[in-house]
Structure formats: C-alpha cells, structure tokens
Amino acid sequence: MKIMLKPLMFSLLFIVVFTSCKNNNDGPDVSSVKINLTTKRFEKDFFAIDTNNIIPQINKLATEYPRFSDNFLTTILGIDSKWPPDTTAYYLKGFIAYNRSVYDSAEKIFANFSPYEKDIKKGLQHVKYYFPAYKIPNNIITYIGPADGYGDILDENVLIVGLHAHLGKDFPLYKTSAVAETYPQYITERFTPEYIAVNCMKNIVLDLYPENTEDKRLIIQMIEKGKRLYLLRKFLPGIEEYKLAGF
C-alpha cells in the first residue's frame, strides 16, 4: 500500500525540510540509511521466449513476475484478457519480432545495470532520510515496451524502468512518425540512460506530492511545480539542474 501524504502534513514536512537542510550540493550523508533493492530483468526473460510455444512460457513468466506480467500484457501491450490464446500468441510474436532490434540495442547499452541501480538506490536513501515513514520500493523491474507507450512507472513496491525509453536521443526508433507524434523531440532528447534515476525519483515525488488538478491558476501551478522540483533536488543532490527540470 502506498503512503499518500495529506496536503497539510506535506506542507509541514516541506517547511521542516526547507529550513533544516544545509545548502549542500552533495546532500546529507545517507550511507547509514539501509535500503534493500533488487533488480530483475524482465526483458531478458521475455525475449528469450520460444515463440513456437509462447502461451505456456507466458504463463510461466506470470509466476515469476506475478503482478508485473499481467500489467505488462494488458496495460503496456494492450492485450485483452478475453482474446483467444491464438490471437494473443500472434500479437506477442509480432511484438517480439518488431522489437527484437530494440532489445538487442538495450542488451548492449545495459549489459551492466548496476550503475543505474546504484544511482536509484542513492536517491531512495535520500527519500528515506527525509521521509522515514514512506514505504520505499525494494524492487526494480526493467522491460522493453512500445516506444510510443509507457516509460518509467512506479507501482506498488517496485520501480519499473522502460529501457526502450533510454537508448540515446539519436536512437533511430525515436525519429519515426509513430513515436514523434507521442513524444516530440524536446522529450526524446531526454531518452538517455542518465535519466533513469531522475525519472524514478520524479515518480516518487509525484507519489509523495500528487499534482493538484483542481486549482488551475498559473501561480498555484508554478508553486506546486516548484515544490516538487525542490524535493527532486533533495533526492538527487549534485545532479545537473537541467536534468531535474520538466515537471
């Protein structure tokens, strides 16, 4: 269960954080803050599927990734649970074939995911430092999805990283019309590995402090965005300012 802070509680915490923290680009010493974090590479298991025996192997994945597997199929890929098995198998075969080159590129770029896990873990240590009651995700799941679809997601107890959204700003797929219609160039400029931790922490910030969609006044929206950006700075001290913008 996610911990959602009430606006008043958050305002008080915000004041405490704002007035008590030193202006230090390196942030506080969080080395003693214990975070258990495990990364699972869903895309490796998914693209290793024998497409001649796809349904039984998808069912096996469902036991290994019980919550994410269902979300991946229905929400990310858009598969209707009412489809006949043959239709689902045909759709999945097409997705795997079309995205094989994307997976191959991700395998090269993210052969070692440890540096990104380390950055995420450090960010989570800062979250725990400032908000000790917040339930910190202790899992990372990486995946490959449609390039014009979801990217990085926060789910219950897990940070979900869409590697297809971090292959480098000049990756050919991002230049296609299908992707450009969803993600214009100013967004795909940030489709690089260095934004993985940033996006994960942005999702944490939005979980702590959801957007206020009721008050549309510009000044209120500016204040709201400023608060979220301030928190992001605290969670990722030392990160260049241009990487943190974009709320």
Predicted regions and their residues:
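C-terminal motif of bacterial Sec signal peptides marking the signal peptidase cleavage site
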Residues: 17-20
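Glycine- and acidic-residue-rich phosphate-binding/metal-coordinating active-site segment common to enzymes
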Residues: 12-13, 178
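Bacterial N-terminal signal peptides that target proteins for export
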Residues: 1-9
